[in-house]
Amino acid sequence: MLSSLGNPRQAATQLLNFALILSTAFMMWKGLSVATDSPSPIVVVLSGSMEPAFQRGDLLFLWNRNIVQETDVGEIVVYNVKGKDIPIVHRIVRKFGAGPKAKLLTKGDNNAADDTELYAKDQDYLERKDIIGSVVAYIPFVGYVTIMLSEHPWMKTAMLGIMGLMVVLQRE
């Protein structure tokens, strides 16, 4: 089983194959980011605040190409709050004004109150520039893998270790 590591050329080939897989995944992610004009074109729903529309673990696909187009009330958007690095998936419930400077108020479908408490200090509303993207499609429950990996770090280490071993010990 470990005899394949004895040949330096074969070990180098397997290492390069592993690097190729990682770089291809990275290029696909960056390509999707450019195509959707979103820094995070795919997000996972982390809480139950959007039930019944979206469940925890749903994988959402975002589109941000319509940055000049008006954002409408009822649209489900993903936004980042200044100073926080966790994207929030909520629905626009009120809109004040028009154009890129319109003030937007969001709320989770399963929440009793709007999101003003979630916004950054001295921020009462969102603007279009705060929005990462609008939800255009989703796949139910697929994102549970990432939730499990973030809630149980040992699973991430084990999974990466197994994948690395499979690549290194693979015979052609």
Curated annotation (Swiss-Prot):
Family annotation (CDD domains): S26_SPase_I
Protein's UniProt keywords contain Transmembrane helix: yes
Cytoplasmic side: 1-14
Reactions mediated catalytically: Cleavage of hydrophobic, N-terminal signal or leader sequences from secreted and periplasmic proteins
Keywords in alphabetical order: Endoplasmic reticulum, Hydrolase, Membrane, Protease, Signal-anchor, Transmembrane, Transmembrane helix
Compartmental location: Endoplasmic reticulum membrane
Topology term for the membrane: Single-pass type II membrane protein
Region of interest (C-terminal short (CTS) helix), residue spans: 158-169
Keyword ATP-binding: no
TM region(s), chain numbering: 15-35
GO molecular function term, any single one: serine-type endopeptidase activity
Main location: endoplasmic reticulum
Any one cellular-component term (Gene Ontology): signal peptidase complex
An individual GO BP term: signal peptide processing
Positions on the Lumenal side per record topology: 36-172
EC number: 3.4.21.89
Residue positions of the active site: S49 (charge relay system), H90 (charge relay system), D115 (charge relay system)
Assembly and binders: Component of the signal peptidase complex (SPC) composed of a catalytic subunit SEC11 and three accessory subunits SPC1, SPC2 and SPC3. The complex induces a local thinning of the ER membrane which is used to measure the length of the signal peptide (SP) h-region of protein substrates. This ensures the selectivity of the complex towards h-regions shorter than 18-20 amino acids. SPC associates with the translocon complex.
Role this protein plays: Catalytic component of the signal peptidase complex (SPC) which catalyzes the cleavage of N-terminal signal sequences from nascent proteins as they are translocated into the lumen of the endoplasmic reticulum. Specifically cleaves N-terminal signal peptides that contain a hydrophobic alpha-helix (h-region) shorter than 18-20 amino acids.
PANTHER family: SIGNAL PEPTIDASE COMPLEX CATALYTIC SUBUNIT SEC11
Protein family: Belongs to the peptidase S26B family.
Domain notes: The C-terminal short (CTS) helix is essential for catalytic activity. It may be accommodated as a transmembrane helix in the thinned membrane environment of the complex, similarly to the signal peptide in the complex substrates.
NCBIfam families assigned: sigpep_I_arch
Name under which the protein is recorded: Signal peptidase complex catalytic subunit SEC11
